Amino acid sequence: VDAWKPLNDGFERLCEKYPRFKNTNNINHLGTLGTGNHFIELCLDENNDVWVMLHSGSRGVGNRIGSHFIELAKKDMERWFINLPDKDMAYIPEGSDYFNDYVQAVGWAQDFAMANRVLMMNNTLQAIQDVLKIPFQANVEAVNCHHNYISHEHHYGKDVWVTRKGAVSAKKGEMGIIPGSMGAKSFIVRGLGNEESFCSCSHGAGRIMSRSEAKRRVSLDEHIKATQGVECRKDESVIDETPSAYKPIEAVICLLYTSDAA
């Protein structure tokens, strides 16, 4: 409840205009991981230091916000007779009816996502301390990355809106996280400020198989073998997240490095 208090006023303002955002388990979801490829992971780096890494976002309420404005954008494309190569490329132009509301809603969802991750990180550290039964403290910089969001930035001499979908900000010196699959290593990186990528880099390895294809093509035995040496779930319900469903993370990192992104 305490974590929700700073979010409440903004949420109430959103719901005054968009009642659909209510009843989205917004309070109950705060401090929860979610499904899909969301995870909490304990990692050892090359110095045998422990990193606690988690991947989660704005949960059900963020999904409702995104879905609602996507519907509005598609309707506006039809209303303005704008023909797109794909209907999923619908957009909300700056200065249009819903633009300011969209920016406000996405900004609030980013705040929710940040609060969600902070709450889970604190709970995870407390759980580790409870198990180890010895005091410890985290003495390194915490790294936080939004990876599905919009940001008002200055590029090529202009103020622009940057949409990062499955991408993180990689300004010069900025720290970022690029997770691998559940059977691969993850990387903590520093951005190089590449303007050609609008100071962005990959958020992860990226899929080479859809969830349904992975479930169809990968056996449980193959999944168990691929995650050998990793303490994680090894049952049929997580085969859609099996390592072979993703690109090799080393290849992704190599490409980012050679392209001066991170």
Question: Where are each of the predicted segments found?
Answer:
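A structural-propensity feature for long, helix-poor, extended segments
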Residues: 1, 88-104, 227-253
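Accessory "access/gating" subregions that flank catalytic or transport cores
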Residues: 5-46, 98-191
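Hydrophobic alpha-helical scaffolding
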Residues: 59, 63, 106-114, 213, ...
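Internal alpha/beta scaffold segment
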Residues: 60-94
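Conserved small/polar residues in nucleotide/adenosyl-binding loops
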Residues: 257-261
